[in-house]
Structure formats: structure tokens, C-alpha cells
From Swiss-Prot:
Disulfide bonds: none annotated. Gene3D superfamilies: 3.90.79.20, Nucleoside Triphosphate Pyrophosphohydrolase. GO terms for molecular function: magnesium ion binding; manganese ion binding; NAD+ diphosphatase activity; NADH pyrophosphatase activity; RNA NAD-cap (NMN-forming) hydrolase activity; zinc ion binding. Divalent metal cations. Mg(2+) or Mn(2+). A divalent metal cation 2 binds at residue 178. Belongs to the Nudix hydrolase family. NudC subfamily. This is NAD-capped RNA hydrolase NudC. It is an enzyme of class 3 (hydrolase). Its EC number is 3.6.1.-, 3.6.1.22. It comes from Haemophilus influenzae (strain PittEE).
Amino acid sequence: MKILQQDDFGYWLLTQGSNLYLVNNELPFGIAKDIDLEGLQAMQIGEWKNHPLWLVAEQESDEREYVSLRNLLSLPEDEFHILSRGVEINHFLKTHKFCGKCGHKTQQTQDELAVQCIHCGYQTYPVICPSIIVAVRRGHEILLANHKRHYSPNGGIYTTLAGFVEVGETFEQAVQREVFEETGISIKNLRYFGSQPWAFPNSQMVGFLADYESGEITLQESEIHDAQWFSYDQPLPELPPTGTIARKLIHVTLELCKAEHKCD
């Protein structure tokens, strides 16, 4: 981090937790003085549109109006990823001010994105929590679940199954475990789909497609309110927002369901 001078120039990333400051739905751009950033701490984390991209250290009090990162999923993917990166870096810096080994204060390293203990020298890098997310298909049907956190009296969002990868577990094992734990369904033909940084606050969603193998839906009631098979040609419940990897998985799987039905 450096103390910003009045003429420091570029795009500016300001965060408050998972919220960001935007001007007309875009990152503020210009010199530090014009955006009231002079004297604040910031670090350059790359470039955006051929100009320096600065991440400003979070302030305890800030009268600017911030918008939730969740409300920005419709932005172009590269822009959403830039915003997610800023949120995750500031989360890391805010939660690693002290050494996890000896408890003394840390400081940022100069040559890489990390913090180092000023007492014992222990170095810590940004923590990324890997999570799997999977769409399961059975012929021309897709398995969708209404998680308890998504439930509402009107039904709420139905989405794909997801969960954190456990210690010592492969992504493939995590997918099979999560699907079976939450729905009692066994799967096969597992294949990688894609990934998405998920800065709430520091996950990496790794997406898969899978086919049904066996079993009847048996809910993990502590996690899942409802789960059903939905045919591609029937009315669907409320789905995750456009821009999420969950929505992309659902779209691709519904296309596979449609193709399967045409081949019957």
C-alpha cells in the first residue's frame, strides 16, 4: 500500500465488505484529488482499459453510496471478475492484520500479494475456499433444489447443488458426496464445466455436469427445503440470477435435456 498523492491517476476500486462504489455503474476514473482519495492508502493491482487499476484500503467511515456485488452479476464477465478480485483482496488484508502463528502484527510484502509477520516472519497468502457446483441430468429432466437459505413463502429460487470441498478430498469426490448427502442421488459421467470467482467472501466455484445413476430423492432437511426433477419443457421455478455459474449450468443442462428428448 502507498499513500495516494493528488495526481495519482487511473481507475479506482473502493469496497466495503462485498459492496463497491461505482459511478453510473462503472468504476470511478480520474485523479485521486478529484475523487477525494488523496491521502488514503491504496495499491495498484493491475490495469483496466489500459489505465492503472487501484484498490483503495477500506475506510471505517465512508459517506459514499455502495452497491452489493451480488447486484452486479449482469456486468460483463471480465468486469465482474475485476470487482470480485478487489473485494477478495481487501477481505484478505482486513482479516489478516495479525499473524495466525504468533499473534503479532503483519505487514504487506513488497514483491507479491501476501502479508508477513513483523515478529516471526511467517508469510500468509490470500485464502481461497474451493467449492463445487453441479447440474445433474436424468434424460430430459434436470435436478433442481430449493435450499433453505433461498426459501420464501412464494417458493424462492431453485438451483443446482453446491458445497465446499473438504480437506483431503478431490473435486470429483466432493461433487459425488454433496449430491448424495443433499438429495440421496448417485451420479455418473461427471465432467468439468467451468469456474467462477465468488467473493462472498472468498470462494472459487468449480462447476460440473453429471448424469443420474440411481436413487430416489431423499432430502438433507438441515440444508434443503425441496428438490425435484424438472423437464425442460415444463414451467420452471425461479432460477438463479443471470451471470452466475449456476444459471449457466442450468442453461447448458436444459439444452442437453432438449437434445435427449429429440433423440427419443
